[in-house]
């Protein structure tokens, strides 16, 4: 790791169909073994399913679902005099987005529908309506931070 300066963040290109950078990040996270075309097919068909069910712009639904999953606080371990405390800290905007994307994908993978398109569409709809595993993960994270509010003075 260089001490001179931090590595520059690379901007992802907007996706082909909707022209949305966040959607590209989502596809990149979903991608396995560099198979981007497979990830694109899964995401686009999931968004088509969502559009068929709610009669709204699919990207709008995607962003609403993502906003409902983004955490505002999380806990980080801090060692103080032999004891480890779970210290609540605010989450940076870039990390919020990354966590929300990761949680949505993991929640979709753990669902019981047959295809990944169905799972992803179901999880996006659930997240849009503030329910589902990804939203539960966010609420659990917030509860953990709230429970450890007493240690917030150990913040860095």
Curated annotation (Swiss-Prot):
GO terms for biological process: translation. One of its GO terms (molecular function) is tRNA binding. Keywords: Ribonucleoprotein, Ribosomal protein, RNA-binding, rRNA-binding, tRNA-binding. The keyword rRNA-binding applies. Pfam families: Ribosomal_S7 (PF00177). The keyword tRNA-binding applies. GO terms for cellular component: small ribosomal subunit. Belongs to the universal ribosomal protein uS7 family. PANTHER family: RIBOSOMAL PROTEIN S7 (PTHR11205). One of the primary rRNA binding proteins, it binds directly to 16S rRNA where it nucleates assembly of the head domain of the 30S subunit. Is located at the subunit interface close to the decoding center, probably blocks exit of the E-site tRNA. HAMAP family: Ribosomal_uS7_B. Part of the 30S ribosomal subunit. Contacts proteins S9 and S11. This is Small ribosomal subunit protein uS7. It comes from Rhodobacter capsulatus. The gene is rpsG.
